Amino acid sequence: MLVLGSLRSALSCSSTASLISKRNPCYPYGILCRTLSQSVKLWQENTSKDDSSLNITPRLLKIIPNDTDIVTLEKQDELIKRRRKLSKEVTQMKRLKPVSPGLRWYRSPIYPYLYKGRPVRALTVVRKKHGGRNNSGKITVRHQGGGHRNRTRLIDFNRWEGGAQTVQRIEYDPGRSSHIALLKHNTTGELSYIIACDGLRPGDVVESFRRGIPQTLLNEMGGKVDPAILSVKTTQRGNCLPISMIPIGTIIHNVGITPVGPGKFCRSAGTYARVLAKLPEKKKAIVRLQSGEHRYVSLEAVATIGVVSNIDHQNRSLGKAGRSRWLGIRPTVRGVAMNKCDHPHGGGRGKSKSNKLSMSPWGQLAKGYKTRRGKNQNRMKVKDRPRGKDARL
């Protein structure tokens, strides 16, 4: 930085000397006047050449940053402005003219930033639909079948590739409730899809620190790891890093379980987890999941900063049964509407399950029945999710 100032207008020798002598009687008035006048003359001789060459009046106090500083400051200002704008942004719901019941009750969130074209074909594959049936033709997953043809997007849940990556666009994915982001590596130019976090927009730069701290970041910190600077640089929205590098209390998503595995938890729309504690002696961390359950994960497991995008997915209304069929979801028949041979609630005169407890088609109790007992308990679970009146909404 080049700092230019003026002592001509700011320092009037007589007034300044009188002010100093009044506050400090030990300094004589005459000596102060001579000293100040000499300093002003020396300053004028030294700065007259610089002022004439730069065409800057000495009365003006200006700070002229370097080109690199200007670029950095502009980027920071743009980022802050965009975050303020996003914080005030309210998602509008799409409503259609109520010509029919299916249009009357249809609600869908509007996201103007979504890309309207086709996905990158090299990052998609064709997956044949099986209608919820296994290799022997038996239904193993109910309520599946039909639906519109689509290609499965290949999502990078591991994020092993380091270096800065720029978000090209945010896309709709028919295979999941969240949105996805197309990334382009700034060095190699390689394309990849990741789960988009809330607030991620085209032009943003994200980075993965799963393989460690890059040398460029170490050089910025002076060759030594400064925890404060490292936390500010790495814990940005959309960045992927080990849980050992994430501060306690940070909101994360796409949380892994093992040191080398992909992200497993909190991948659907609007979900997130929170880092509660780190236990270096056990090489584990405690994470609170979306359900409220506290769970152990590896301290070197992967996680991404932020909340999963498409938070208003829960507020949508399909409006009619046909839209569920377009999504590949078949109807769910009530047990009391079935025959006795098909469901424990079936049969009888009228639609009543009699005095039986609610249960599944295979006789398993549906309300309050614990399915894990004894040695089959999950050892990684620290605290069970809240139930009943304490359940999370």
Swiss-Prot record:
Pfam family, any one: Ribosomal_L2_C
InterPro entries (alphabetical): NA-bd_OB-fold (IPR012340), Rib_uL2_dom2 (IPR014722), Ribosomal_uL2 (IPR002171), Ribosomal_uL2_bac/org-type (IPR005880), Ribosomal_uL2_C (IPR022669), Ribosomal_uL2_CS (IPR022671), Ribosomal_uL2_dom3 (IPR014726), Ribosomal_uL2_RNA-bd_dom (IPR022666)
One cellular component (GO) term of this entry: mitochondrion
Transit peptide location: 1-43
Biased composition (Basic residues): 369-380
Keywords: Mitochondrion, Ribonucleoprotein, Ribosomal protein, Transit peptide
Main location: mitochondrion
GO function terms (MF aspect): RNA binding; structural constituent of ribosome; transferase activity
Effect of mutating residue 343 to Q: Causes a cold-sensitive respiratory growth defect. Does not impair assembly of the ribosomal subunit
Renumbered residue ranges of the record's region Disordered: 337-393
Cited Gene3D superfamilies: 2.30.30.30, Nucleic acid-binding proteins, Ribosomal protein L2, domain 3
Location of this chain's protein in the cell: Mitochondrion
GO terms classed as biological process: mitochondrial translation
Coiled coil regions in record: none
Composition skew (Basic and acidic residues), residue ranges: 381-393
The organism's place on the tree of life at top rank: Eukaryota
Record note on quaternary structure: Component of the mitochondrial large ribosomal subunit (mt-LSU). Mature yeast 74S mitochondrial ribosomes consist of a small (37S) and a large (54S) subunit. The 37S small subunit contains a 15S ribosomal RNA (15S mt-rRNA) and 34 different proteins. The 54S large subunit contains a 21S rRNA (21S mt-rRNA) and 46 different proteins. uL2m has a Na/K ligand binding site.
Membership in a protein family: Belongs to the universal ribosomal protein uL2 family.
Extra remark beyond the main annotation: Present with 1600 molecules/cell in log phase SD medium.
Role summary: Component of the mitochondrial ribosome (mitoribosome), a dedicated translation machinery responsible for the synthesis of mitochondrial genome-encoded proteins, including at least some of the essential transmembrane subunits of the mitochondrial respiratory chain. The mitoribosomes are attached to the mitochondrial inner membrane and translation products are cotranslationally integrated into the membrane.
UniProt name for this protein: Large ribosomal subunit protein uL2m
Upper lineage: Eukaryota, Fungi, Dikarya, Ascomycota, Saccharomycotina
Primary gene name: RML2
